[in-house]
Amino acid sequence: MAVSQEPDTPIALSVGEGELIGTSVVKAARPEVSLIELEIKPGGSVQPHLHKGHSDSFYVLEGEVEFYVGDEVVQGSPGTYVLAPPGVVHFFKNVSDEPARALNLHTPGGFVEYRRELETLHAAGEKPDTAFFERHDIFDV
């Protein structure tokens, strides 16, 4: 079954199925929820940031991922769930020598468009500016 943006359409995807964006696989791209399967390379990380208008959560599938959420540091292994509510600074890093995989859930949705636009910029050899990130509710700190 394909990824649907329609709120009343069911989604049922197997491992690896979905819309491929870079090394990420989009499982759901809806106004109410975005679900993305991330592959995080060894040492891979994101900058500390926050979202003003949505929650950002992670469920570790494989590997070891260190999460920083507010004042907490969580050593994530398979089965670990982490939630960063709106306004809470968060970031993560793969702290192992092996790739990690995690499900990344954004509520409400709309975050997949950010991933698509970012991949297009990278493919063109361009870097996003601050306005790009703010338009997608990402505020670096």
Predicted regions and their residues:
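Short acidic-glycine-tyrosine-enriched beta hairpin
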Residues: 6, 71-89
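A short, N-terminal "cap"/entry segment at the start of jelly-roll beta-barrel domains
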Residues: 1-34, 120-141
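Glycine- and acidic-residue-biased ligand/ion/polar-headgroup-sensing regions
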Residues: 53-65, 70
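Conserved short histidine dyad/triad with adjacent acidic residue
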Residues: 36-51
